[in-house]
Amino acid sequence: MNKVLEEISKIGILPVVVLEDAKDAKPLAHALCAGGLPCAEVTFRTAAAKESIAIMRKEFPEMLVGAGTVLTVEQVDEALEAGAQFIISPGFDEDVVKHCIEKNVPVTPGTCTPSDVQKCYRLGLDVVKFFPAEAAGGLKMIKSISAPYTQMKFIPTGGINANNMKDYLEYDRILAIGGSWMVKGDIIKSGDFDKVEALTRQAVEKLREVR
């Protein structure tokens, strides 16, 4: 397994971040690191994503920072220019996956069916995103899908929160969970990064109960 993905596995929780303004990147990264989660998936849902990744990588070199919601090869290149260390997409796009492989950057495409996982398996991937996790059947579905793919690990994202996170993390085929409850948009917009840090600490405490 790729070293970056191994580090994400050790951390256990991947905060999924949507930043409307790059000025929030530095204080948000500080709050996550201080709370015990030195990693972030910065989604390409906004124009601030590329600059935000660059700021986090520069100001917090110890942090693992990747790009999420990557839909095109062009966005892969933008993310890598900013310093992204991994790529995550909501679904499987063969061009995106192959481009990441060529660039030697870890990529975890979104999956929610055996066919999706099979496509990733055939391209040599050993970690995939399961999205939208809760809406697509949750942990029960992951257990069913994972049975034929004994080497595949999953990063479930979507609908995961402080109340159900432990259920996912207890399953040994879960590499890490993706979540946004500690980095919700309204908290970031209000500038309450102390709350981000507090919610992050609480998440880490729950994580330590099972890992």
Feature-to-residue mapping (PLM):
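Glycine-enriched alpha-helix->loop->beta-strand junction motifs that scaffold or abut catalytic
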Residues: C33-P38, E59-E62, E81-I87, E102-T108, ...
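Conserved N-terminal beta1-alpha1 strand-loop-helix module at the mouth
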Residues: M1-A82, E102, A162, K189-R211
